[in-house]
Amino acid sequence: MAPPQTIPRRGLFIGGAWREPCLGRRLPVVNPATEATIGDIPAGTAEDVEIAVAAARDAFSRDGGRHWSRAPGAVRANFLRAIAAKIKDRKSELALLETLDSGKPLDEASGDMDDVAACFEYYADLAEALDGKQQSPISLPMENFKSYVLKEPIGVVGLITPWNYPLLMATWKVAPALAAGCTTILKPSELASVSCLELGAICMEIGLPPGVLNIITGLGPEAGAPLSSHSHVDKVAFTGSTETGKRIMISAAQMVKPVSLELGGKSPLIVFDDIGDIDKAVEWTMFGIFANAGQVCSATSRLLLHEKIAKKFLDRLVAWAKNIKVSDPLEEGCRLGSVISEGQYEKIKKFISTARSEGATILYGGGRPQHLRRGFFLEPTIITDVSTSMQIWQEEVFGPVICVKEFRTESEAVELANDTHYGLAGAVISNDQERCERISKALHSGIIWINCSQPCFVQAPWGGNKRSGFGRELGEWGLDNYLTVKQVTKYCSDEPWGWYQPPSKL
């Protein structure tokens, strides 16, 4: 029996309960693999944001914070582990919903759910460990003072997340924010909110204190903008486009509000001629750009090939690309599903046509797979004869499209790799480990992969440089995003300070 092609009907999740949006509006949810409407989500607006922020502020300060913000980290850890357990219990259902909502292969969505559960478990451990790090002493040069550090939650945080890994990207923010003791308003992308709303259902099941996590779905200008500019939101964490990130920075600057931004990328993958196994390098190249249909901020979308191996490498890359199963994402073995929406589909096609008009060669792909007449599907696409002035070299496509240039020397490869406004990630494949270490230091990126592309571990920091944003998610750095550091210094001497001449005694 085929799985159901519908989604649960949910409201906004505010104050631990479901609420219909104040204006009563809802947005259709379209399965991008079939173009069928499979349900709808609530369309929140500024009025709903106001209610959610009030719920979060109340949850932060309720009873002096003893139930959440000032509770022991071990208390919060119990809730995070309970969420992780429910994610595992509902893994198959959540993966299916995410596939229906986003068009990604079911295998990929299933793996994402494993990562979601692991992320909540990891930050549960860090929440517990935080208890032991409070009042860390500071060594001072004066014996009559003692000083220590407190780490405290920032407060109410707005979390605005993208559509490419809907629940996972939300979890990268929700889990550390809750571990820190913050209360939160999550605003997922309107293009893929279904699994995030199910997180609200899970929080109800486990008894998360009301208002600790609130979920507002809706359009960016109507819900995201009021959230990022709200005077009672203490921080905004955003993952998405560079242009939206700029607007959030401008809004936050009016209140000197901290933000962390994980934005776009145009990451390079450099392959040298000393590799022993071309197919091994080709597969990593494929994974770096065709996984999740290339809708990955860190996708290694610029391939730099040493001129001595370029032809042989491209021949194998085309052969491997032809072998990818592009299909309905629910089919077993699917490795390339649809892109997220009609708008994204048309945007990617425009990038490809512009590359062709500017003189590039579409070596493989570039259009709709002939066997798929419906849905927003694109072939894996390889573009050669690219110059650095072309749009396809400079701008983020966010689709299954890779552009290729050749190089002769290591210094030329590094120069080409750094020829971008972005700085999220970079990769190098070579058997010369000293060369790999040199290039790791030379690339202007926050993440470097050696002999691979795209591995991601919750224990390691994630974030970029330049127009790819600032701040780091994941690992202990992800927790620090949601903590403030407070210095406490005590004067311990029985003697007076003695700076001023005392008045005469009566």
Curated annotation (Swiss-Prot):
Reaction catalyzed: 4-aminobutanal + NAD(+) + H2O = 4-aminobutanoate + NADH + 2 H(+); 3-aminopropanal + NAD(+) + H2O = beta-alanine + NADH + 2 H(+); 4-(trimethylamino)butanal + NAD(+) + H2O = 4-(trimethylamino)butanoate + NADH + 2 H(+); 4-guanidinobutanal + NAD(+) + H2O = 4-guanidinobutanoate + NADH + 2 H(+)
Record's keyword annotation contains Metal-binding: yes
GO molecular function terms noted in the UniProt entry: 3-aminopropanal dehydrogenase (NAD+) activity; 4-trimethylammoniobutyraldehyde dehydrogenase activity; aminobutyraldehyde dehydrogenase (NAD+) activity; betaine-aldehyde dehydrogenase (NAD+) activity; gamma-guanidinobutyraldehyde dehydrogenase (NAD+) activity; protein homodimerization activity; sodium ion binding
Coiled-coil spans in chain: none
Active site: E262, C297
Alphabetized UniProt keyword annotations: Metal-binding, NAD, Oxidoreductase, Sodium
Pathway assigned in UniProt: Amine and polyamine biosynthesis; betaine biosynthesis via choline pathway; betaine from betaine aldehyde: step 1/1
Binding-site list for NAD(+): T161, P162, W163, K187, P188, S189, E190, S241, T242, E243, T244, E262, E396, W462
GO cellular component labels: peroxisome
Binding site for Na(+): D101, L191
EC main group: oxidoreductase
Enzyme Commission code(s) on record: 1.2.1.-, 1.2.1.47, 1.2.1.19, 1.2.1.54
Site feature location: Transition state stabilizer: N164
GO BP term (any one): glycine betaine biosynthetic process from choline
Protein family per UniProt: Belongs to the aldehyde dehydrogenase family.
Its job: Dehydrogenase that catalyzes the oxidation of several aminoaldehydes. Metabolizes and detoxifies aldehyde products of polyamine degradation to non-toxic amino acids. Catalyzes the oxidation of 4-aminobutanal and 3-aminopropanal to 4-aminobutanoate and beta-alanine, respectively. Catalyzes the oxidation of 4-(trimethylamino)butanal and 4-guanidinobutanal to 4-trimethylammoniobutanoate and 4-guanidinobutanoate, respectively.
Protein name: Aminoaldehyde dehydrogenase 2
Organism encoding this protein: Zea mays (Maize)
